[in-house]
């Protein structure tokens, strides 16, 4: 949305008949803070996760008041979803909640699994392609799709770097001119920057150089 090249025709077609919010702001970014906010229903300043690393990349612990099940287990969105908005309770005819995602592995964020009845890790740290994820989802749906009362979360990484479109797609934008704002001065400024997904690390980075 808002990009000058036609890189997402299917999403654009969907958007023509969908609601577009012009003044919406994410409460917590990027990936790890946003997922934790989604899971807990709380801002990062309250759940403890506001960064990808350091002391602010793990949920706050319950402390001395923690019971057998943690607050994450009792109040995470899968638990709330399964209980119609109420905290988790055992021995109920709950909605079955399932996640197919390598997010927890990629970010060492295993609190993401809290409240899910089933969790499937594709095992490639988010470098898997949609067909690999879909194969697991298709198998689960074949076995369970005809049942009632379930929620299936399927996480595909293809829109995320490194962008892995099939080779058959070619380079459809190779001959298109660059936008007018992209001057040599702008290019040099970005090139001198640093960090994951910057101009010099456009494909991301490996936490351990030996894994790169």
Q: For each predicted feature, which ranges?
A:
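Catalytic domains that recognize anionic headgroups
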Residues: 1-212
